[in-house]
Amino acid sequence: SQVVGQVFSNPQVLILTAAILGVLGLIPGMPNFVFLLLAGGLGALAWHGGKRQAAIAEEETPAAAAPAVPPEAQEASWTDVTPVDVLGLEVGYRLIPMVDKAQDGELLKRIRGLRKKFARDIGFLSSAVHIRDNLELKPNAYRIVLKGVEVGNGMAFPGQFMAINPGRVNGPLNGRETTDPAFGLPAVWIDAGQREQAHALGYTVVDASTVVATHLNHLILSHAAELLGRTETQALLDHIAKDNPKLVEDLVPKLLPLASVQRVLQNLLDEGVNIRDMRTIVETLAESAEQLTDPLELAKRVRVALSPAIVQQIYGPVRELDVIAIEPELERILTQSLTAQSGAMLDPGLAELLSKRAAEAAKQQEDHGVPACLLVPDMIRTAMARLL
């Protein structure tokens, strides 16, 4: 019965059978009437069966999809708003293998290491570096962006090496002359076969991945304050609160809002002071916040509390410091001119002379292998730092 049902439910089979019977009905000597009658009946069944299957197929077929709307004709939505990366690295197509995980990109590994080192040395976890290719760049070019704004760029040549002249080399090298993007030193891109010669002449030799990574690290350090946003500040306080919950609770928001704490930390980072010792920072802020609210003044208090660590960061564990001092009379003039309470202004000629003499003294210190450090009264320290 299933076979019969399948046969009579298939219009194609019925049509074929009707055609065969119709041909037989036309042959002389055959029972023509019977064959033609059967052919007509099967043809009618095939016609009705075809209509029924078409109706079923129409019911089961989903409605045709609406024609696609061109992107430019669609209404704007929040999905069109693309967040700006806090920190990004864009590379030309020849540098893609350096950052491609599938190709075991060496630069990718170095960037991960840089972020970990930054967290250990500076004291907070910065935003991840978002890496993407940019076909608008030259094939060997790269650029570093901070909040959508370019802060650095350069060229790198995979397979070649940058020979950097530290200032004392014994001869020139053949290659593509350039400048070290991180520190501005003269350099040359050389082939791998020239590495030993470059080392022998006194050059510092690094590969392409190291060039880009060093440049990126230099810019991250110099823009540390901008990388410390509200999210990073809150995460930093939450991290400290795991071991010192009461300390953080007493500070934020009871004494200071989160924005003020962020600004204090940014002031410290702007002046090259790391914020690793958050316990001392939070304690100092809690002690000072009842008398002070200005983030700049609070940062000064924190600097004093961190002074042993700041000195050791510059000089190492030494008991005597070799510093540059200012003559008493000049110090008096500067104090009168640079303090906020005084209406006097620093004479432009004196400012130029001061900058020149300070640069000369700093060079002498550096030539003797000593950090350049100028000793000034606390009340003019910030102004002198900006001036010099």
Predicted regions mapped to residue ranges:
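Transmembrane helix-loop junctions at the membrane interface of multipass transporters and ion channels
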Residues: 1-47
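Juxtamembrane/interface segments at transmembrane-helix termini
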Residues: 33-37, 48-62
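Membrane-embedded alpha-helical signal segments
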Residues: 56-388
